[in-house]
Amino acid sequence: MPKTPNVPGTDRPAEKAAGHWLLAQLGKKVLRPGGRETTNWLLSRALGGQIDVVEFAPGLGITALEIVKRSPKTYTGVDLDPKAAEIVRGRIGDNPNYTVVNAGAQETGLPDSSYDVVVGEAMLTMQTDKHKLEIMREAARILR
């Protein structure tokens, strides 16, 4: 398989790569159930005013860029993959209120009751039922 530059997981053989990174290597860089239109519709209703937003598993930062264009008070991306976290940092620009942490969505290390909105586009579908529950509990913990 040809390697796509700047895509995490390119150091692993296809049979060992995470499904979303394998799709990214093949050119499918955004996983959006419902498509871009649905994502934009949801973001336009969820993101308004001075709110604090956390995004679980921002991947290559495509949705992160859409979020920061809406000027939230803060944006925090949480990605387990260090290369993905670095890519998202590059996309969101140099704003002290916009950060990316290298952590898992089930244990972010973020403070309790500190965010207004959690975004996690298509990331739960790739998790076991146990991990889905852990991620949802973490989201509930960090939401106000």
Outline where the language-model segments fall.
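N-terminal, positively charged/glycine-rich alpha-helical extensions of SAM-dependent methyltransferases
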Residues: 1-22
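Class I SAM-dependent methyltransferase Rossmann-like catalytic core
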Residues: 17-36
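Conserved alpha-helix/loop element of class I SAM-dependent methyltransferases that forms part
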Residues: 32-50
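A generic alpha-to-beta junction signature in SAM-dependent methyltransferases
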Residues: 46-47, 92, 143-144
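Class I SAM-dependent methyltransferase SAM/SAH-binding core
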Residues: 54, 60-107
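A short acidic, Gly/Pro-enriched loop at the edge of an enzyme's catalytic core
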Residues: 106-118
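A short SAM/SAH-binding and catalytic strip from SAM-dependent methyltransferases
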Residues: 117-130
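A short glycine-rich, Lys/Arg-flanked "PGG" loop and its adjoining helix->strand segment in the class I
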Residues: 133-144
